[in-house]
Amino acid sequence: MCQVSMEQNMTETSAGQAVQQPPSQATIADLMRPPPTTIEPADHAAAAAYLMKHAGTTALVVLDAKTGQPVGIITEADITHAVADGKDPNEVRIHDLMTPDPTIINTTASIRDAAIIMTRGHFRHLPVTSDSGLVGMVEITDVCRALIGPFPFE
């Protein structure tokens, strides 16, 4: 569980960025991992696993091939469940596994807003947008680090 700390300190997120404002003032732009790794709905799950491994991420934003707009999100858990259910990752398509219409957060939103959205929706990842479109991804570990400070074992 994330607890909000109102102390001003410098926190390094897992994205390797320092958040220098108190958590109450920091925004998603201070925290997100740019650029997001994306995939299309018609691609295979094996391609998603490959991209995740090489990008060092556990989720991909699924973009509509024609509009370039986010239409879903696929996570390592989605692929793991499919394989455990006997589906061939070289055959099953992203559109069959993805969570459609993902909740998206804007770069100007607060870290607290992200924590609330992620907690209520049981999300580990949120695609991040700005006026120019999709610009990043924020993970629950980034939000927790920003709110509670560096973990003792780091």
Each model region followed by its residue ranges:
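Tandem CBS (Cystathionine beta-synthase) repeat/Bateman regulatory domains
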Residues: M1-E154
